[in-house]
Curated annotation (Swiss-Prot):
UniProt-recorded name of the protein: Large ribosomal subunit protein bL31B
Similarity section: Belongs to the bacterial ribosomal protein bL31 family. Type B subfamily.
Species of provenance: Acinetobacter baumannii (strain ATCC 17978 / DSM 105126 / CIP 53.77 / LMG 1025 / NCDC KC755 / 5377)
Keywords on record: Ribonucleoprotein, Ribosomal protein
Keyword Ribosomal protein tagged: yes
């Protein structure tokens, strides 16, 4: 087996900025930023969204208002739907 062909696997600190939650996960990602967390320095990655802030995982229900769009579509194309 060849040596030095696999990327370096290390603990990386991911920060969900929306929920202000930190995750310490093993990863091969390479970063230029580092941050001290629980007394040790880790590579640092910021996230816009994760399982801590995504509506699907948090249980927040966001319904898109399609009724207005459907009504405007039907109004616009109602004249083509005439039955003879």
């Amino acid at each position: 087996m060849r040596k030095d062909i696999h990327p370096a696997y290390q603990q990386v600190l991911f920060h969900d900025t929306n929920a202000d939650v930190y995750f310490l996960i093993g990863s091969t990602i390479q970063t230029k930023q580092t941050k001290e967390y629980q007394g040790q320095v880790y590579p640092y990655v910021t996230l816009d969204i994760s399982s801590a802030s995504h509506p699907f995982y948090t249980g927040e229900v966001r319904q898109a208002s399609n009724e207005g769009r459907v009504a405007s579509f039907n109004k616009r194309f109602a004249r083509f739907n005439r039955k003879s």
